[in-house]
Amino acid sequence: WGGEEFLAFLPSVPRHRMDEVAARILAGINATVIDHGGVQIAVNVSIGFAPFPLAVGKQMMAWERVVNLVDMALYMAKSHGRNRAYGVRGFADGDRVNLDVIEQNLEHAWRSGQVDMTIVYGDPDMPRAANA
């Protein structure tokens, strides 16, 4: 089963509440069950998120690059089991951060300490569709 990708721009959400908003979206989607011909289909979501504006050191990133990082975070969420959100919070010391390298492999950059990320998990007891 495939899904659609959506971009939500939420300028009124402060940085310190982004994890909470991701958790609320996960819970809201997880609470949805679709009845198709008497078969209950559970719905889940994978989320990538980041604050905007986002800076590397003192240099503000172009919105296109932020969206690219969010997309990469989304795919990290999908590859690590879905029903979760991966968020980019910021970067290590701006002088040693190479954004081109980070954009090649966000997960490696995160694990090597170049990127500050957060993970928000959905309900682990959520019923999963057989092919999720």
Language-model features: locations:
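Catalytic core regions of nucleotide second-messenger enzymes
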Residues: 29-46, 78
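Catalytic strand-loop-helix junctions within cyclic-nucleotide turnover domains
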Residues: 9-18, 37-40, 46-66, 91-92
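Heptad-repeat coiled-coil signal-transmission/dimerization helices
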Residues: 22-23, 67
